[in-house]
């Protein structure tokens, strides 16, 4: 099987670029996509992002999380280095945990139009409480909409112990 041709990757500009510029403000425009070579089948793509940081909008204190992003692609897929830089752009962004996860999901839906996507943030405790917002989306009118409902109802049936962070 042949790999991808350079012309297939013309819109992927950050991967392999030695002059990467790190943005310090929320920057959804940095996200890049490439074509899904297997749109005829369902499969999950999962990103584990253990170095997410943002700021509390009230106190300005830093918040830290591992974010899990899973999606079933349609025609387009997010390029991982652009995703890394996008997530890094939240470093000085002041928003609540729940808002950050929904913003990330909405930006990825707008970018890729996936069949299904879920974003789960597992934030480290602050003040003795950890917050783990989960959001998902299934394309309306399809089996993925039903899948989203099912996964939402069952996403956290077995709460974890806090010692796993």
Curated annotation (Swiss-Prot):
GO terms for biological process: queuosine biosynthetic process; tRNA modification. Substrate binds at residues 78-80, 97-98. The active site is at residues 56, 63. InterPro entries: GTP-CH-I_C/QueF, NADPH_dep_7-cyano-7-deazaG_red, QueF, QueF_type1. The keyword Cytoplasm applies. Pathway: tRNA modification; tRNA-queuosine biosynthesis. It is found in: Cytoplasm. It comes from Bacillus mycoides (strain KBAB4) (Bacillus weihenstephanensis). Belongs to the GTP cyclohydrolase I family. QueF type 1 subfamily. This is NADPH-dependent 7-cyano-7-deazaguanine reductase. One of its GO terms (cellular component) is cytoplasm. GO terms for molecular function: preQ1 synthase activity. Keywords: Cytoplasm, NADP, Oxidoreductase, Queuosine biosynthesis. Its EC number is 1.7.1.13. It catalyses: 7-aminomethyl-7-carbaguanine + 2 NADP(+) = 7-cyano-7-deazaguanine + 2 NADPH + 3 H(+). Gene3D superfamilies: 3.30.1130.10. NCBIfam families: QueF-II (TIGR03139). Catalyzes the NADPH-dependent reduction of 7-cyano-7-deazaguanine (preQ0) to 7-aminomethyl-7-deazaguanine (preQ1). It comes from the Bacteria.
């Amino acid at each position: 099987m042949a790999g991808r041709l350079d012309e297939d990757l013309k819109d992927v500009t950050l991967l392999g670029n030695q002059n990467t510029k790190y943005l310090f403000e929320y920057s959804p425009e940095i996200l890049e996509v490439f074509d899904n070579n297997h749109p005829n089948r369902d499969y999950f793509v999962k990103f584990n992002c253990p170095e997410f940081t943002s700021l509390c909008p009230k106190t300005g204190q830093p918040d830290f999380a591992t974010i899990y992003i899973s999606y079933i692609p349609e025609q387009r897929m997010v390029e991982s280095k652009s995703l890394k830089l996008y997530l890094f752009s939240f470093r000085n962004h002041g928003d609540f945990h729940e808002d950050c996860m929904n913003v990330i999901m909405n930006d990825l839906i707008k970018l890729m139009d996936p069949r299904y996507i879920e974003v789960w943030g597992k934030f480290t405790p602050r003040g003795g409480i950890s917050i783990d917002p989960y959001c998902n989306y299934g394309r309306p009118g399809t089996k993925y909409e039903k899948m989203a409902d099912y996964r939402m109802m069952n996403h956290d049936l077995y709460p974890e112990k806090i010692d796993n962070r």
